[in-house]
A protein has these predicted regions:
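Glycine- and charge-enriched low-complexity intrinsically disordered segments
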Residues: 133-152
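His/Asp/Glu-enriched, well-ordered alpha-helical/loop segment
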Residues: 1-113, 122-130, 134
Length: 156
């Protein structure tokens, strides 16, 4: 799934409603899939949408169709445990446990305890790859993502 498509600017809600009518309410059926036991993960489909996990979590929890909203915990699982499991990488990633990679972020608020509508305001205050703190990068998010994909190494 790609929760960021819930508010994708290239397909505004008005446009989808003109074409699909009431069926537009069934787009991105997160809750329906979750309740049927389908393991779903969330991604951004960058560069079509921003590679912003916090925004994806916010959209999954604040889905415009209330019947399709996930809890904050479920939205977090989509980006962590479920993503690792679907990528056949659950032995190394997805949860924090001895022997795993220990890739994680520090946030300025707990998405499980703040009001759901505030999740999108959370800011990342630290990034760790393989349990090593990655200092803030001048290149911003794109540089950090590329570094993470390279296993924590930068090309010079």
């Amino acid at each position: 799934m790609q929760a960021p498509f819930i508010d994708w600017a290239q397909e505004p809600d008005r446009y989808l409603r003109e074409i699909l009518g009431d069926r537009a309410d069934g787009l991105n059926p997160l809750r329906s899939m979750w309740d049927r036991g389908i393991v779903i993960a969330d991604g951004s489909d960058a560069p079509c949408t921003r590679p912003d996990p916090i925004r994806g979590m916010h959209l999954a929890v604040n889905h415009p169709n209330p019947a399709q909203r996930l809890t904050p915990y479920e939205a977090l699982l989509m980006r962590t445990r479920n993503a690792a499991w679907l990528g056949f990488d659950e032995r190394e990633r997805g949860t924090l446990a001895p022997g795993k990679r220990a890739d994680f972020t520090l946030l300025d608020a707990d998405p499980l305890t703040i009001p759901p509508q505030s999740i999108g305001d959370i800011r990342v205050t630290g990034l760790y790859l393989r349990a090593r703190r990655i200092p803030p990068q001048a290149g911003g998010v794109a540089h950090v993502i590329l570094r993470a994909l390279a296993g924590g190494k930068s090309r010079k």
